[in-house]
Regions:
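A structural motif corresponding to the C-terminal lobe/cap of the Radical SAM core domain
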Residues: 111, 117, 121, 136-164
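Conserved AdoMet/S-adenosylmethionine-binding subsite of the radical SAM
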Residues: 2-5, 9-137
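Radical SAM enzyme core and accessory elements
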Residues: 167-175
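Short aromatic/hydrophobic-glycine micro-motifs
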Residues: 27, 141, 170-171
Length: 175
């Protein structure tokens, strides 16, 4: 069972209860999260699930705030804590041309990941796409309310990002 959509940690009571029930039934659980939550909750959830999928959107805290609505210090601190716990996790990085796929951000992200304690995590690049745009239109909701210029990264940009990570000793795959 994968818990995702919005931020599952914002529904902590239900999430904890469901993780406990799944564990009793030997059902594998994954929590897809930004880790923007109280460290005590993160520690508890990490100890109850089988895998964490953790997004890193931007290393610059001000730009992270601009694009994701929150600063990233708590997120990065929680990632470091989870890494130190030895909990299985995968770092996922959405690649968005004009937002976070630039060389500096990629180098900063790779450097951060390579500095984490414990075993080097798997890293997945998720190239931006606008598949959800049609769904938002059908539902009458706004897809990109802040009109952030978002573009799918070119193969050249994707390959450059992979090389930057590789040069930092971090293997990243493209999903």
């Amino acid at each position: 069972v994968t818990f995702c959509g919005g931020e599952p940690l914002y529904n902590k009571e239900a999430l904890i209860e469901l993780l406990d029930r799944c564990r009793k039934l030997s059902i594998h659980t994954t929590v897809d999260t930004s880790l923007h939550a109280n460290p005590e909750l993160v520690r508890e959830v990490a100890g109850k699930c089988d895998l964490l999928l953790i997004d890193i959107k931007h290393m610059d805290s001000d730009l992270h705030h601009k694009y994701a609505g929150v600063k990233n210090e708590l997120i990065l601190s929680n990632i470091r804590m989870v890494a130190g716990m030895g909990v299985p996790y995968i770092i996922r990085i959405p690649l968005i041309e004009g937002v976070n796929a630039d060389e500096k951000n990629m180098a900063d992200t790779a450097r951060f990941i390579s500095s984490l304690p414990g075993k080097m995590p798997k890293v997945e690049f998720l190239p931006y796409h606008d598949i959800a745009k049609g769904k938002h239109t059908k539902l009458g909701s706004i897809y990109n309310p802040n009109n952030v210029p978002m573009e799918k990264p070119s193969e050249e940009v994707i390959n450059r990002c992979v090389k930057i990570f590789k040069s930092a000793g971090v293997e990243a795959i493209v999903k």
